[in-house]
From Swiss-Prot:
One GO-annotated biological process of the protein: 'de novo' pyrimidine nucleobase biosynthetic process
Pfam families: OTCace (PF00185), OTCace_N (PF02729)
Molecular function as annotated in GO: amino acid binding; aspartate carbamoyltransferase activity
Role: Catalyzes the condensation of carbamoyl phosphate and aspartate to form carbamoyl aspartate and inorganic phosphate, the committed step in the de novo pyrimidine nucleotide biosynthesis pathway.
Record keywords: Pyrimidine biosynthesis, Transferase
EC number in record: 2.1.3.2
Residues reported in the UniProt entry to bind carbamoyl phosphate: R71, T72, R121, H151, Q154, G280, P281
Listed transmembrane segments: none
Enzyme class name: transferase
Species whose genome carries this gene: Cupriavidus taiwanensis (strain DSM 17343 / BCRC 17206 / CCUG 44338 / CIP 107171 / LMG 19424 / R1)
This protein's name: Aspartate carbamoyltransferase catalytic subunit
NCBIfam families: asp_carb_tr (TIGR00670), PRK00856.1 (NF002032)
Keyword Transferase: yes
């Protein structure tokens, strides 16, 4: 008998219960998340008196960040509070995990405190999957980045940003530039872009920072910025993931900028209305020139703003789905 594979993110009815990866999500499901996010964007308007909705009132959201984060943790906290949830940010360095308690012991103890949702960032690929397998049926898990594997909410907010400025995915050329080998954002973006029907996704970077198998994912590989940026609609820049590198993969930051930094001159090779994105944190003068980061074609701060609405959408959707 053939064993049927079940996506661990989905309920028996195919609804989103956890968000662990963009891989395995349908185009309709991704579009539903983006459409839901658009309903929350107006909550960020500075002239709006009330910025909360009661969708998660009475629910407890635990942010478990085993790696440092500023944007992601903060936007998840804002998103949960705007949904009226009670939010607890666990200080990992001061917690029992730093004293030898296992990951699952930590989860079990927090679950005993009536947790309804865990937002998890962990250095080990697959950690959110492990947690999702062991939580109670009513508890939801959102992956806020696991090792090199995935960063699904970043991928979704990137898709929201692209859709906001470009409308139609099916006639775009998108270039992802930099340290793709170590980037969970790149993996999530590639899965999302190909699922949404983007006809050409390009990866640009030195051979030492590009993983094998990109072509099998439908990605065109370039080792030259000048060649890879020609005629693109969207440029997604990635930082060097020095904390995940072992050994000297590059000569120096200066040499990297010389070969792969996004300058105004290189950006001019893209379409005149191309947009520039970056998941942050940026290393100015390494992968991106300040003139580009702060320029008219940059939508980097828009990504941060849209990230709140996208994370609200994800939390609201998963909270409504149980087996």
């Amino acid at each position: 008998m053939t064993k049927t594979f079940r996506n661990p993110q989905l309920t028996k009815n195919g609804e989103l219960k956890h968000l662990l990866s963009i891989e395995g999500l349908s185009r309709d499901m991704i579009t539903h998340i983006l459409d839901t996010a658009s309903q929350f964007v107006s909550l960020s308007d500075s002239d709006r008196d009330v910025k909360k909705v009661p969708l998660l009132r009475g629910k407890s959201v635990f942010n478990l960040f085993f790696e440092n984060s500023t944007r992601t943790r903060t936007t998840f906290e804002i998103a949960a509070k705007r949904l009226s949830a009670d939010v607890l940010n666990l200080n990992i360095n001061a917690s029992s995990t730093s004293k030898g308690e296992s990951l699952l012991d930590t989860i079990n103890n927090l679950s005993a405190m009536s947790a309804d949702m865990f937002v998890v960032r962990h250095a080990s690929s697959g950690a959110p999957y492990l947690i999702a397998e062991h939580v109670a049926p009513h508890v939801h898990v959102i992956n806020a980045g696991d090792g090199r594997h995935a960063h699904p909410t970043q991928g979704l907010l990137d898709m929201y940003t692209i859709r906001h400025f470009k409308k139609d995915f099916t006639n775009l050329t998108v270039a992802i530039v930099g340290d793709i080998l170590h980037s969970r954002v790149a993996r999530s973006d590639i899965h999302a872009l190909t699922t949404l029907g983007v006809p050409e996704v390009r990866a640009i970077g030195p051979r030492t920072l590009l993983p094998s198998g990109l072509e099998q994912m439908g990605v065109r590989v370039f080792h030259s910025m000048e060649e890879g940026l020609k005629g693109v609609d969207v440029v997604i820049m990635l930082r060097l993931q020095n904390e995940r590198m072992s050994g000297a993969l590059l000569p120096s930051a200066q040499e990297y900028f010389k070969a792969y930094g996004l300058t105004p001159e290189r950006l001019a090779l893209a379409k005149p209305d191309a947009i520039v994105m970056h998941p942050g944190p940026m290393n100015r003068g390494v992968e991106i020139d300040s003139a580009v980061a702060d320029g008219a074609q940059s939508v980097i701060l828009n990504q941060v703003t849209f990230g709140i609405a996208v994370r609200m959408a994800v939390m609201g959707i998963v909270a409504g789905n149980n087996d």
